[in-house]
Amino acid sequence: MDPCDCSKTGTCNCGATCKCTNCQCTTCKKSCCSCCPSGCSKCASGCVCKGNSCDSSCCQ
């Protein structure tokens, strides 16, 4: 289950490095909102995506 409901509420409890599109957080886990770019089909569970990049540690 996702740790927050960004798609429903538009907000979530996050920090300060992640660029999110559908919520007003600046840092979040992948399951919180779409931090990773469209090229990243799936992020590792519990992964914190940093910035707009998605590397091998975040993707699987």
UniProtKB/Swiss-Prot annotation:
Residues involved in a divalent metal cation 5 binding: 33, 35-36, 49
Keywords associated with the record: Metal-binding, Metal-thiolate cluster
Residues that bind a divalent metal cation 7: 49, 54, 58-59
Residues annotated as binding a divalent metal cation 2: 6, 12, 14, 25
One GO MF term: metal ion binding
Residues annotated to bind a divalent metal cation 3: 14, 18, 23, 28
Family per similarity comment: Belongs to the metallothionein superfamily. Type 1 family.
Function: Metallothioneins have a high content of cysteine residues that bind various heavy metals.
Protein name as it appears in the record: Metallothionein
Organism in which the protein naturally occurs: Barbatula barbatula
